[in-house]
């Protein structure tokens, strides 16, 4: 479990493609007091640290994870958001983020204080004004929604301390809706579906 508060923006320094998986090495300056088995959010993707060589953190990526996330498009030099898993007693500064990416969205416009995204169809029911969403692992509040387009308000601190400061229009991002919102919407949809069946 994560909080959506990014602790470091790090650089992908190594990519090793295998037949049905891949290995990535991320150069981190701050989050190096870790051991194999530690859980990380890498751009919102829950990954397990396999090994550490000085400042280089190694993660294995499954075929399923590649299919559902932007990690398959990484190149050497890609900047990624890192967060260690929440531990007992840690402050939850954002919202609970599972690290299970549900879809890939696209940045369609960038303004001084706002960023606009196009959401994949499967996430549209869970994108509600003033609700939470994790974008590349960052806990953000949704400002406005129109169909599959929504905006978030960004303060300069968020741009400076996350990979969003490196993103351009057209970039793809990992999206995970707020789990509480998703559970409530799914429950309501299931209730109405069962009601229709019973008629």
From Swiss-Prot:
The keyword Transferase applies. InterPro entries: ATP_synth_asu-like_sf (IPR023366), Lumazine-bd (IPR001783), Lumazine-bd_dom (IPR026017), Riboflavin_synthase-like_b-brl (IPR017938). 2,4-dihydroxypteridine 2 binds at residues 46-48, 60-65, 99-101, 130. GO terms for molecular function: riboflavin synthase activity. Its EC number is 2.5.1.9. It is an enzyme of class 2 (transferase). Keywords: Repeat, Riboflavin biosynthesis, Transferase. It comes from the Bacteria. PROSITE patterns: LUMAZINE_BIND. Coiled coil: none annotated. This is Riboflavin synthase. It comes from Chlamydia trachomatis serovar D (strain ATCC VR-885 / DSM 19411 / UW-3/Cx). The gene is ribE.
